[in-house]
């Protein structure tokens, strides 16, 4: 989709959702404009206006840094596809043929969640999203395609129940409230009998509500993707066919467009992905073309590099925020390589050097993975 069309779709959809909207003049550093109403504001970042690059310290975004060394028992070794971190747990999504694993913050394997197979509580499809809710003591797994359900387990890995939906789910994203309500957003297809963009079930699996899709959300094939990183209180998501980041308001049963990158009249829109943090909108330009960080409060936009000032001032991945946590997973050999590279930098201070060398000496190259993680600060903290 050409971006100018995507921009028109976003603005057109917004004018349907709200009334008395108006486009404001640029604010902040001039890279942003806003489409505003009494109940919402759509932030538009103009790609051709973003020129500068800044460093952001990790300590500005997270409360502290934890370094987790996962245990070296045979059952605990893994290759991570994705992870879900909470205050006490680390959930590891593996490949299609391997089960979900649950660790504690000491890196100890607590359990395997369910099992691979086709029996009750088993799964053979790729996990597409997961949620761990410590209030309910449950783990929720959703799957890539064609299953009309979300599987629920306890934190001992035992199957508890399934949430059965009205329609087969396609690339579903899930969030669970403290009261156990589960919200599901997925890609609706034109051929679905029961078309919904979002749906909510209570903790017992009883249907509560759904939001029907407008035509621009309906899909003909699997060429698009849906993303949700679960870093803010609202259900923040974006569907690549619309190229706008939305919030789903469960209480109002509405969606609101919140952020859009305007690429102007470029003949080909650069491949990109959106993420949202409490204080930033992030746009990852794929193929190592940088991360654009929009500061919500200052109303500024810059290319951004993330610096891990907790650990040797090593550069860290700016986009690695999910479920309210920063994460950076290393195989031991890769961490050794990055530390050695940092030690050759001319700006590596004596203090940083000591910290890095101490860590380097402690790494078992044949050991399990090592995780750097930190909980996101919430807005105003």
Annotated model-derived regions:
Residues 71-80, 99, 103, 108-136:
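Blade-loop segments of beta-propeller domains
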Residues 78-82, 124-130, 168-177, 218-227, ...:
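Repeated scaffold domains used in trafficking and secretory/extracellular systems
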